[in-house]
Amino acid sequence: MMKDLLWAESQKLHRSKILWIAGFATVMVGLIVFAQGQFSFYDRRYINGAGWFMTAAQSLATFYVLPAVIALLGSYMICREEQEDTLKSLRLIPVDEVKLTLAKMILAFVFSVLIYLLLFAITFLVEAVLHLEALSVGLVLENLKIYFLDGVGVFFAISPIIALVARMKKGYWLALVFAEIYSFAGLFASMSQQLKTVYPMTAVFNISGYYNANMFQVLIGVVILMVCVILSLLILKGLNRKTK
């Protein structure tokens, strides 16, 4: 049953423009960071440093762009039937709405990871073209790990926003606005050692290894993200009760 729901939801996404929006936003992040890399520091361009592009793109994308895109994608999937007035027709079919919502969240999680891996692929290709010989296997694998864990962690961090917007039924574009404010606030949270440990968006960086964090900070980050997941599930549970 869950497999069929995942397949059906993936087919709906393939027919929508939301994936193109997500892909375009990811490519634009790469282009913007590449342009920033042309600036010089002591007569040396940032882009000339091996690994700089992969590192800079990851942080800029997380603070400014990708959480909002992922939140938009997730809330779009959940709100789509409501917005397009097809929910009543869907209820004529014996579909478990709780499982359907869970399938949408799982698919949004998968796309969150894929979006970050797409950004990694873009940055790695640029790094390989510019200075292949300077790249070590360890550096590439470390960045791959960071991007992958960011994709996982960012989805967990913003899952309450996706669930809340779905509960509010005010339009999935609100998720983009809320997530943008939420992720941008991470810049200010990162200035404080205490806030950096407990704020969900920066806790992701502690877990992924982007920040130099000790084991205690990593464990706190895991707990914070688990709280976000539990909160989103509670909100979605209320959503399904409301729609019955």
Report the location of each language-model feature.
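Generic transmembrane alpha-helix motif of multi-pass integral membrane proteins
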Residues: 9, 13, 91, 159-170, ...
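Hydrophobic alpha-helical transmembrane segments of multi-pass membrane transport/permease proteins
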Residues: 17-40, 58-73, 114, 175-186, ...
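Terminal transmembrane helical anchor/hairpin motif
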Residues: 35-54, 172, 176-244
